[in-house]
From Swiss-Prot:
Keywords, in A-Z order: Membrane, Photosynthesis, Photosystem II, Reaction center, Thylakoid, Transmembrane, Transmembrane helix
One GO CC term, this protein: plasma membrane-derived thylakoid membrane
Blocked amino end (Met) modifications at: M1
Ranges per topology, Lumenal: 1-11
Protein name: Photosystem II reaction center protein M
One GO BP: photosynthesis, light reaction
Chief localisation class: membrane
Pfam entry (one): PsbM
Biological function: One of the components of the core complex of photosystem II (PSII). PSII is a light-driven water:plastoquinone oxidoreductase that uses light energy to abstract electrons from H(2)O, generating O(2) and a proton gradient subsequently used for ATP formation. It consists of a core antenna complex that captures photons, and an electron transfer chain that converts photonic excitation into a charge separation. This subunit is found at the monomer-monomer interface.
Record field: transmembrane: 12-27
């Protein structure tokens, strides 16, 4: 099976970007709860 490099990069970005965004939101809410 030949993997299309551009398709692989697009899939990786499609998965990684929302994951990083959710992690950042989670860390921000966690730090706010601890400080208050």
């Amino acid at each position: 099976m030949e993997v299309n490099q551009l398709g692989f990069i697009a899939t990786a970005l499609f998965v990684l970007v929302p994951s990083v965004f959710l992690i950042i939101l989670y860390v921000q809410t966690e730090s706010q709860q601890k400080s208050s």
